[in-house]
């Protein structure tokens, strides 16, 4: 068996048969079903990829002015202050260092001391504005993510038929491969997404999610999750492969372990 899935060659064979006027009504029906599976699956995948992205952009622009006005009224500053408390303390620590520097040089020049006070005051206002902007962005991201999750979940529930078609199409593509190509595909996906070679990708993803939800970058938490989560996921996935494919195709399990080693 070559690297081209049998489902694709079958579809091309049906199409060629139809062009040569050798087709029967059953073959035409099968060809239409195959075309529907491909188009419905690709449309569903496109919606899953671009729907959250489009919702995020549209609601970020729409919620921005409302969140800014709501935050500036001072109704929830205390409630959300803990989200960026560590970051704010670190920034204002710089101001404290500048005050200490001022005390050291205030005897040398009164003019210089006055300029330093002005600079410290300006820097303080700048940091307060930056902190205020960060808090507004955190709230906007939280609201946008909740709305995006709700809409995506509703679409996912309402489109169970397309999900069934997508699942059928993927299974047809996968099971039409040879055992060697199946094992190669599984190893490629696992190493790329959840394997031991994807630790840097997990680090970037965890850092991006934490910043998106307003949590301060914590190197200890990231360094603890990155080496642990891929190992657990890889172990669970290998166990599932052994339980599932050992009943369907035992040679695939043997080839998978041989290639993985």
Curated annotation (Swiss-Prot):
One of its GO terms (biological process) is potassium ion transport. The chain crosses the membrane at residues 47-67, 138-158. It is found in: Plastid, Chloroplast inner membrane. Belongs to the CemA family. Keywords: Antiport, Chloroplast, Hydrogen ion transport, Ion transport, Membrane, Plastid, Plastid inner membrane, Potassium, Potassium transport, Transmembrane, Transmembrane helix, Transport. HAMAP family: CemA_PxcA. It catalyses: K(+)(in) + H(+)(out) = K(+)(out) + H(+)(in). GO terms for cellular component: chloroplast inner membrane. PANTHER family: CHLOROPLAST ENVELOPE MEMBRANE PROTEIN, CHLOROPLAST ENVELOPE MEMBRANE PROTEIN-RELATED. InterPro entries: CemA. This is Potassium/proton antiporter CemA. One of its GO terms (molecular function) is antiporter activity. Contributes to K(+)/H(+) antiport activity by supporting proton efflux to control proton extrusion and homeostasis in chloroplasts in a light-dependent manner to modulate photosynthesis. Prevents excessive induction of non-photochemical quenching (NPQ) under continuous-light conditions. Indirectly promotes efficient inorganic carbon uptake into chloroplasts. Its main location: plastid. The lineage of its organism: Eukaryota, Viridiplantae, Streptophyta, Embryophyta, Tracheophyta. It comes from Ginkgo biloba. It is a multi-pass membrane protein.
């Amino acid at each position: 068996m070559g690297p081209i899935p049998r489902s694709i060659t079958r579809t091309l064979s049906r199409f060629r048969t139809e062009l040569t006027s050798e087709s029967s009504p059953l073959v035409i029906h099968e060809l239409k079903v195959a075309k529907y599976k491909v188009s419905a699956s690709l449309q569903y995948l496109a919606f899953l990829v671009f729907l959250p992205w489009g919702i995020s952009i549209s609601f970020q622009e729409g919620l921005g002015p409302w969140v800014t006005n709501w935050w500036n009224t001072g109704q929830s500053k205390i409630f959300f202050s803990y989200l960026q408390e560590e970051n704010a303390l670190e920034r204002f620590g710089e101001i404290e260092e500048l005050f200490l520097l001022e005390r050291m040089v205030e005897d040398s020049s009164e003019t210089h001391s006055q300029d330093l006070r002005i600079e410290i005051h300006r820097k303080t206002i700048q940091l307060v504005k930056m902190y205020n902007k960060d808090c507004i962005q955190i709230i906007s991201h939280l609201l946008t993510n909740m709305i995006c999750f709700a809409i995506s979940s509703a679409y996912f529930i309402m489109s169970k038929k397309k999900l069934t078609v997508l699942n059928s199409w993927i299974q047809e593509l996968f099971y039409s491969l040879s055992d060697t190509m199946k094992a190669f595909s599984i190893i490629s996906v696992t190493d790329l997404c959840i394997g031991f070679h994807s630790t840097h990708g997990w680090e970037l993803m965890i850092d991006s999610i934490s910043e998106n939800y307003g949590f301060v970058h914590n190197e200890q938490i990231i360094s603890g999750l990155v080496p642990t989560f891929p190992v657990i996921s890889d172990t669970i996935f290998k166990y599932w492969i052994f339980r599932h494919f050992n009943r369907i195709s035992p040679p695939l399990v043997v080839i998978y372990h041989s290639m993985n080693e």
